Swiss-Prot record:
Keyword Iron-sulfur in record: no
Disulfide partners: none
NCBIfam families, per the entry: pcna (TIGR00590), PRK01115.1-2 (NF002219), PRK01115.1-5 (NF002222)
Highest rank taxon of the organism: Archaea
Family of the protein in this entry: Belongs to the PCNA family.
Species annotation: Methanococcus aeolicus (strain ATCC BAA-1280 / DSM 17508 / OCM 812 / Nankai-3)
Protein's UniProt name: DNA polymerase sliding clamp
Subunit structure: Homotrimer. The subunits circularize to form a toroid; DNA passes through its center. Replication factor C (RFC) is required to load the toroid on the DNA.
Gene name for this UniProt entry: pcn
Biological process according to GO: leading strand elongation; regulation of DNA replication
Alphabetized UniProt keyword annotations: DNA replication, DNA-binding
Listed GO MF terms: DNA binding; DNA polymerase processivity factor activity
Keyword flag DNA-binding: yes
Organism placement in taxonomy: Archaea, Methanobacteriati, Methanobacteriota, Methanomada group, Methanococci
Pfam families tied to this protein: PCNA_C (PF02747), PCNA_N (PF00705)
């Protein structure tokens, strides 16, 4: 038994946030909600999503593993209208997930379930020296600037309280410098200076589905995986991206 009802717009944003990095995923559902952990195919990035039952208007579930093709699910959610209600139901007899959209009428899609085993991927417990709380729109625009120069970007923290997004090409550079007085910075927690370099395309994928006013929690340390967290309603998303170790 699995049945869940929520606003279609919110679920679409969750699926967009996941499908930018992985093609298929195993949702672990139980009486507490839906969760999933997955690595991207290159094992460079990890994503963790937790959708508690409080996120739903209605929620009833036993324990199941539901493996889905995210590309197929994303295409369906792209057809959803903002004011529609979404109902998810597990059809165990047909081994399908029913996706029902309701507003003035009812539209029903059914997708076959994948034999995707429950993931053993865990989010590692890492102690970070620095944390930046920042509006997502500022990060998205800064990454667009950095992309003009290189396909990698460095995230720096200075001891005097600055967060720097920096890229360097063969002849050109780009730098965005933000401090505590910047209106997009909610909070800076700094214990030490740090610098790490990351694949820019992955950072763009991680932030692609965010809204400009979403608050990102970015955890940083020198040559450490960057940890990025944000909330969609009651849903928590966590990303880890491995650094590019420079010689």
């Amino acid at each position: 038994m699995f049945k869940a009802v929520m606003n279609a717009k919110n679920f679409k944003k969750i699926i967009d946030s996941i499908s930018n990095l992985v093609d298929e995923i195993c949702f672990e559902v139980d009486e507490l909600g839906i969760k999933a952990n997955a690595m991207d195919p290159s094992h460079v990035a990890l994503i963790s999503v937790n959708i508690p039952k409080e996120s739903f208007d209605e929620y009833v579930s036993d324990t199941h593993d539901i493996g889905v093709d995210l590309e197929a699910l994303k295409k369906i959610m792209n057809r959803a209208k903002p004011n529609e209600k979404l109902m998810l139901e597990l059809d165990m007899e047909k081994n399908k997930l029913d996706i029902i959209l309701k507003n003035e009428g009812t539209r029903k899609f059914s997708i076959s379930l994948y034999d995707v085993s429950s993931s053993n991927v865990k989010v590692p417990e890492i102690g970070y020296p620095n944390e930046v709380m920042i509006k997502a729109g500022t990060i998205v625009e800064s990454l667009k600037d950095a992309e003009l120069v290189n396909d990698h970007v460095s995230l720096k923290i200075t001891e005097d309280g600055k967060f720097i997004i920096y890229s360097k090409g063969d002849i050109n550079t780009n730098e965005t410098v933000l401090d505590r007085d910047n209106e997009s910075i909610i909070e800076l927690k700094i214990s030490e200076s740090s610098k790490s370099t990351y694949n820019l395309a992955y950072l763009k994928d991680i932030t692609k589905a965010t809204s400009s006013e979403d608050i990102l929690h970015i955890h940083l340390g020198t040559d450490m995986p960057v940890k990025i967290e944000y909330i969609i309603g009651d849903t928590k998303l966590i990303y880890l991206l491995a650094p590019r170790i420079e010689s």
